[in-house]
């Protein structure tokens, strides 16, 4: 079995790497290289500054007789796929005969968590795979081969993607919302994140001018076979493909003991202590300053689209101990290093007290001030000194041991929904370990 892997065939203006892969596979089949198994949809580090949208690469398993020149076929086919030309794209395309080499495995493990240099990636695999196109997308292409090696030992999910006819690209998607809701009712939680948990908005139809009509995610592939029959559309579905993927597996998260070891643009899991009161900033976002066990400080931020996670961050108090996972942004002249929170687990809540007037010892009612420096008095005639105010514990809105997360509409492709963990459909996330 041979492999063809590619990345960076799309741009903000259009295109889609998974669609390019589907078209490539059709060209390969026509040339005599038959598809074997499911194509792989591999999400990479979501914090790469120059990514287009979802930062995805694709790997295609094929069985090709010796007479088929796979490199020539895929190169010719890729030129057709990007014939309209997106100047921002720098495709990477690699062909591997047989099982991908071990070096690809390490590239995947790093590419899903860090930013890699394309030139160094090419050098690392030059002797083991055939590099057909060596643009910036070579990182994702080689990483996709690495995922092909490790997926049997890693958690996987699946996505069924329906594609539009080209004449509909850039127009409003014609999918019957009622059929999506019925599909969700009958298949959830095996399929997940079809609807937003807050307001029920449909999430499976993208808002970009790409060729995707809709995409449905699942913890098992069989249910995706019936999606095209259940989800009704008022435009033709020209292709439908089920991909095996690392989506919703938290593969991007890295457990880090201290901030000094966390790389900018990585996705660390950090244990922190809140040191200042949360503050709201313009736009409805919430920021709070924290520190690690060495006293190194960092801001954590929750943005308005992620509410109610914003309210979770707003409910924190100095002294609270938390575990956070998210995107680590570098320091700028205006802002310190900041973790954009994906998930937050409460480890320990600080006791918060509110100072109140004393309670009358005779009638058990709250006393009132008797005047400046005159202590307190009660309507029954009882009095109390100035220093008799009492501290009353304030109930906290948060709960120790609970992991809070962004809602589906704001969830990253790689981020694991905690409710699937609670239902036993996915393994515990790094925040729970």
From Swiss-Prot:
InterPro entries: TiaS-like_TCKD, TiaS_FLD, tRNA_Ile2__agm2C_synt, Zn_ribbon_TiaS. It is found in: Cytoplasm. Its EC number is 6.3.4.22. GO terms for molecular function: ATP binding; ligase activity, forming carbon-nitrogen bonds. The keyword Glycosyltransferase does not apply. Gene3D superfamilies: 2.40.50.1010, 3.30.70.2200, 3.90.600.20. Its main location: cytoplasm. It catalyses: cytidine(34) in tRNA(Ile2) + agmatine + ATP + H2O = 2-agmatinylcytidine(34) in tRNA(Ile2) + AMP + 2 phosphate + 2 H(+). GO terms for biological process: tRNA wobble cytosine modification. GO terms for cellular component: cytoplasm. The keyword Nucleotide-binding applies. CDD domains: RPA2_OBF_like (cd04482). Keywords: ATP-binding, Cytoplasm, Ligase, Nucleotide-binding, tRNA processing. Transmembrane segments: none annotated. Belongs to the TiaS family. ATP-dependent agmatine transferase that catalyzes the formation of 2-agmatinylcytidine (agm2C) at the wobble position (C34) of tRNA(Ile2), converting the codon specificity from AUG to AUA. This is tRNA(Ile2) 2-agmatinylcytidine synthetase TiaS. The gene is tiaS.
